Amino acid sequence: MSASAVYVLDLKGKVLICRNYRGDVDMSEVEHFMPILMEKEEEGMLSPILAHGGVRFMWIKHNNLYLVATSKKNACVSLVFSFLYKVVQVFSEYFKELEEESIRDNFVIIYELLDELMDFGYPQTTDSKILQEYITQEGHKLETGAPRPPATVTNAVSWRSEGIKYRKNEVFLDVIESVNLLVSANGNVLRSEIVGSIKMRVFLSGMPELRLGLNDKVLFDNTGRGKSKSVELEDVKFHQCVRLSRFENDRTISFIPPDGEFELMSYRLNTHVKPLIWIESVIEKHSHSRIEYMIKAKSQFKRRSTANNVEIHIPVPNDADSPKFKTTVGSVKWVPENSEIVWSIKSFPGGKEYLMRAHFGLPSVEAEDKEGKPPISVKFEIPYFTTSGIQVRYLKIIEKSGYQALPWVRYITQNGDYQLRTQ
């Protein structure tokens, strides 16, 4: 069982648009939603599921709107919330910004979309590429003329239109890895993981098939343990265009890509990561007078790689003043509104070590610092480099017209949640 009705409300709880799918819940029930929401908010007991009598309200907030689904029976809550977020995504793709004004300006098309998105309370067509084939924003109505069945009915590829043409056929593939790291004050790595994704920008004519091969080191989490140097990917998620049956058989990533930009796959490695940029800090607080920092930054990756736009964010006391800085490289800036100093290094080659000193005055009367000190955080980007060692061995482009296409592959490693605690 799914939703009985779906509403879009403004911030005051006024109904902007609604669709009754099952007729088993009185449409005026939604009038109870906002009073219950405000009451729960005041009590500090706000929940994504609210109830009045036998009716459940499942809701999300987006910009200045509430999207609410009602149900009287046992609904599959995860399905309903997934549907509400999908509604936001589809509306945003149609109207750029989903807010009260765009709802008021597009009543006709929204009713058409709600009719296609859900049928008798069950999600139906939620792929915006399919919806855009026969619901156009320009006419605010269904396309007229000779009736044409949706691509899904004809077994065509729903995420790619036919007849696409480019003068220059190109594919850009980015392997992007974000490093999440937490280091304790005594230098122990408490948490480390790599979150990766393969993103593509496709400008290819016709209906091409692409085959992507990754290096032999890469294993997927259900292949069993391999050699000690292998890279075992976890939580692998593919775009819907990937032929999963082919992948299950021989690990070939084969697909007909959507046109333009999309994420082909994402993955995670819960593994010990050697900190790429290591920070050592010595902080000396002289009572009632000053605080001094000595920060050493060391790049722990190969010399042939370089980290770009490195930013080291060092927290300082709220009442610090009169800053003085000295550094062997880059620039240092005090950001008092964030209670931090930012050491910026435009280019940080591998195997290098740099030093920065900072001096702040402190007021003669100071409050006892009972709260824990915020950690040092680091931002960086290393091109032509992956922490996991994942590499693209080949990217084949096959199209019946036989045109030549240029594949471009790029690797980027960047910071995720990268923090080092201080003494």
From Swiss-Prot:
Post-translation changes: Phosphorylation of membrane-bound AP1M1/AP1M2 increases its affinity for sorting signals.
Location of Phosphothreonine modifications: 152, 154, 223
Residues with the N-acetylserine modification: 2
Start and end residues of each MHD domain: 168-421
Protein's membrane topology: Peripheral membrane protein
Single GO MF descriptor: clathrin adaptor activity
UniProt-listed GO biological process terms: endosome to melanosome transport; intracellular protein transport; melanosome assembly; melanosome organization; platelet dense granule organization; vesicle-mediated transport
Alphabetical keyword list: Acetylation, Cytoplasmic vesicle, Golgi apparatus, Host-virus interaction, Membrane, Phosphoprotein, Protein transport, Transport
Domain of life: Eukaryota
Cellular compartment(s): Golgi apparatus; Cytoplasmic vesicle, Clathrin-coated vesicle membrane
Coiled coil: none
GO cellular component, one term: early endosome
Protein role: Subunit of clathrin-associated adaptor protein complex 1 that plays a role in protein sorting in the trans-Golgi network (TGN) and endosomes. The AP complexes mediate the recruitment of clathrin to membranes and the recognition of sorting signals within the cytosolic tails of transmembrane cargo molecules.
Family as reported in the entry's similarity comment: Belongs to the adaptor complexes medium subunit family.
Assembly with partners or alone: Adaptor protein complex 1 (AP-1) is a heterotetramer composed of two large adaptins (gamma-type subunit AP1G1 and beta-type subunit AP1B1), a medium adaptin (mu-type subunit AP1M1 or AP1M2) and a small adaptin (sigma-type subunit AP1S1 or AP1S2 or AP1S3). Interacts with MARCHF11. Associates with the AP1(MU)-Nef-MHC-I complex; this complex is required for MHC-I internalization. (Microbial infection) Interacts with HIV-1 Nef.
Protein name: AP-1 complex subunit mu-1
Annotated source species: Homo sapiens
Organism classification: Eukaryota, Metazoa, Chordata, Craniata, Vertebrata
Designated gene of the protein: AP1M1
